[in-house]
Amino acid sequence: MSNKIYPIGIQNFEKIRNDGYFYIDKTALMYQMVKTGSYYFLSRPRRFGKSLLLSTFEAYFEGKKELFEGLAIEKLETKWEKHPVLHLDLNAEKYDSPERLYDILSRQLTLWEIQYGKGIDENTLSGRFSGVIRRAYEQTGSSVVVLVDEYDKPLLQALGNDVLLDEYRKTLKAFYGVLKSADRYLRFVFLTGVTKFSQVSVFSDLNQLQDITLWPDYGTLCGITLQELLDTFQPEIKILAANNSISYDDAVQRMTRLYDGYHFCINSVGIFNPFSVLNVLKSKVFDNYWFQTGTPTFLVEMLQETEYDLRTLLDGIEAPSSMFSEYRVDSNNPIPLIYQSGYLTIKDFDREFGNYLLQFPNDEVRYGFINFLVPFYTGVRNSDQGFYIGKFVQELRSGDYDAFLTRLQAFFADFTYELNEQTERHYQVVFYIVFKLMGQFTDAEVRSARGRADAVVKTPKYIYVFEFKLHDTAEAALKQIDDKGYLIPYQADGREVIKIGVEFSAEKRNISRWLV
């Protein structure tokens, strides 16, 4: 049994170092940031270590050399100068009114003013912030460090409420704008968040702020690389493997499949989700830990409102580089926010045309997201969908395709009246979701491009080739399978190949018949 402590929910660097928690050393990259620049912005998904990173910078700039014993920066840094640090954490609050945001910022300013004093003519938030920075510099004789954790949290909580969003925008624009005018007093400024909102002029006013979100040098600043995982947690992975009756290599492969796959820049190594890694090693149970901590309800509602074709999202999206530079709240494109929230990641890059390929990073996110979609697009409750998908897979494994299609009929019959009024594309999307979910348990492919069968499911004994027709017959579906040669790739496989033509009735909004 491992005696090391997992820092789940612990974001304070000093506590982690003093109390013997696991810590993966990122201090060489921090040193590089400190020595090559002064103003930074970094976007990363939630629970990826941004808060711990800022806490580590705070300890560094406060000159707490003893906390860095044995870490890379201990050998790199020789001066260990002490600076006043203003650390603003907007992460753990609820922002439901302009007054609430004002009170939270005012409360933080008051804490700083207790330490550095307050000018009698400083009445606005921006005026007080400016005064604190100036006095901290004057009283200590050292330039000031400003760290802002989750600068965009109020804005994210106001999405969908345009009036509230505009109020927050005005408040934060004035507040963060102080950082430009206070430049002569500042040594280092670092803002982190999930999203880069274009309308908040932190980025237009602070032209010296470097957005390192996509920089290859800092692609591994947050999260865990495979090498870091193996170097740090080898004994713990062995325990995880033993508890799940699998080999060490199988445990690593399963962790990789579930939790790896994030890429925050071009040609980056894969990054593991740190929250899921720590939780699976502590609990010794494979589960969707990161996905369960935040439901993407707002993102799914955006997909529905914009009538975004889910099949494109589920298979991968080509996105121009301009999409990464900002997020406009009034945009009809939900993909930038879905990407920045951690549900999509960079998987490839076309250098000639400057386009990125975005896909789900791993199985935790892929199947967590698709499962979450089911109630929104089918009306089937989360508690029931596992029953449906499990039965679908079992019936195809046993060769009982009639039972599978009969159950699929029942699945569509459960739709509410509102869902039955949906468009033809909606039903195509539902078919798509069903077959994608089956991919958790068996080899299931579903078509998004022409020239292939609508769906192919491979089980140990059978290969099923499906063709669905909405405005045509099951006979026409079978003919298309033959005419297009959809069976040819599987003829030498050795498993029994079964072709199935399925006829979907637009009037009944359900499968009407099928032929084999």
Protein language model features and the residues they cover:
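Phosphate-binding site recognition
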Residues: 1-423, 438
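Catalytic centers of nucleases
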Residues: 444-460
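Structural motif
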Residues: 145, 462-464, 498
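A short acidic/basic microdomain associated with nuclease active sites
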Residues: 434-448
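Domain-level recognition of nuclease-like catalytic cores that cleave nucleotide substrates
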Residues: 489, 493-516
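Conserved catalytic cores of phosphodiester-cleaving nucleases, focusing on short active-site segments
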Residues: 431, 455-470, 484
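Mg2+/Mn2+-dependent nuclease catalytic core
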Residues: 165-170, 470-487
